[in-house]
């Protein structure tokens, strides 16, 4: 394999070609930084968190593929991942995971001790998540914790503490993550049943759309509470209304439980998060 092909395989392993996960991680993190700073966050902190999100999302993909390498060959969507195809060896993947983990940890060393402590918990949660699919029917709920962990870290970086407001945003993102990752899990449900992978899509069964709707409503309520506690105004309120519109559209997409529309609904959450973040930022600026 040429160096160029190897680098492409590494990029695919880290999902550099599929930035949706990075974006879904980034929007709530940026919201946390803006809320904690009550406007423009410290530039150093902002850059550290943006780079950190990119690195940790890549690292999460690596450890996920390592854990699932023997199962991915039996799932249509994942059968050509680099660890399955042999383009990247297990040793190479674990080496890359270690190097990226060290890079992320070096970044947080520029911040206060509370952020460093929270980052250690975050790394442990990241490593644990892929194995949850073997022991619980609710791995998406664990993923919600992992993907929301940057929120208390962001508040800690800006304020040196994690106030109540942060936990409203944490719960909003947790509920939102469970909702959109269940949409994603519906895409793989038939394959997951064959190979024994557990998911909320399987757990919820024929009530999947309704329960996704409950989590969307809960996320909406917590986003509203986060805004109320932070004394946000009309523009943030418009962002909340847009979030409702996106949720309704996603419910229409997943109505038939077909793979392509469900995946489209999952991807649509990027726009929901982006618009809500922009509304929050503008609410402080105008």
UniProtKB/Swiss-Prot annotation:
GO terms for cellular component: plasma membrane. It is found in: Cell inner membrane. The keyword Lipid biosynthesis does not apply. GO terms for biological process: ubiquinone biosynthetic process. The keyword Cytoplasm does not apply. Keywords: Cell inner membrane, Cell membrane, Magnesium, Membrane, Transferase, Transmembrane, Transmembrane helix, Ubiquinone biosynthesis. The chain crosses the membrane at residues 20-40, 43-63, 96-116, 142-162, 167-187, 210-230, 235-255, 266-286. GO terms for molecular function: 4-hydroxybenzoate polyprenyltransferase activity. InterPro entries: HB_polyprenyltransferase-like, Prenyltransferase, UbiA_prenyltransferase, UbiA_prenylTrfase_CS, UbiA_sf. PROSITE patterns: UBIA. Its cofactor is Mg(2+). Its EC number is 2.5.1.39. It catalyses: all-trans-octaprenyl diphosphate + 4-hydroxybenzoate = 4-hydroxy-3-(all-trans-octaprenyl)benzoate + diphosphate. Pfam families: UbiA (PF01040). It comes from the Bacteria. It is a multi-pass membrane protein. Its main location: membrane. Pathway: Cofactor biosynthesis; ubiquinone biosynthesis. Belongs to the UbiA prenyltransferase family. Catalyzes the prenylation of para-hydroxybenzoate (PHB) with an all-trans polyprenyl group. Mediates the second step in the final reaction sequence of ubiquinone-8 (UQ-8) biosynthesis, which is the condensation of the polyisoprenoid side chain with PHB, generating the first membrane-bound Q intermediate 3-octaprenyl-4-hydroxybenzoate. This is 4-hydroxybenzoate octaprenyltransferase. It comes from Shewanella frigidimarina (strain NCIMB 400). The lineage of its organism: Bacteria, Pseudomonadati, Pseudomonadota, Gammaproteobacteria, Alteromonadales. The gene is ubiA.
